[in-house]
Amino acid sequence: MMDLPVPGEVEGLDMSELVLTGEGSEPEYAFMQGMGHTYLWLDGYEWRAVRDKQYTYARYLKDGKELLFDNLNDPLQAVNLVDNTVYQEKLIELRNKMADKMDELNDQFMPCTWYRDHWTEDRIIKASARGRF
């Protein structure tokens, strides 16, 4: 958007055309990673999620708990639909999308302290799932 070169190690999608003109393609899904409590490096709060225009699916590492929300009909995400048989097809779709994206990113879904030990040095990020910067 500022006509600056994009370094090769930058991850993500170029959505500048969509932002600037309102035209262009947008991703069908968004992938989200919660690496845990990285300020104090506490394990037990790690999660992954994927969402489309209507639904959000998330899973916690610690206990494997799954969440499925209908963002259009439940914008506060108060009703977990994961056990509702009406939504099983959507649940499976989003589980698979999340697994595919994690495979693509080499996301091993590890405890918070693993990221401290493998991706940082003196609190400076030195690597990501795709490797060193």
Language model features with spans:
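Short conserved micro-motifs at the rims of enzyme active sites and ligand-binding pockets
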Residues: 41-45, 61-62, 69-70, 81
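Polar, surface-exposed loop/tail segments
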Residues: 1-43, 87-96, 111-116
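Long, internal low-complexity/basic segments
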Residues: 81-133
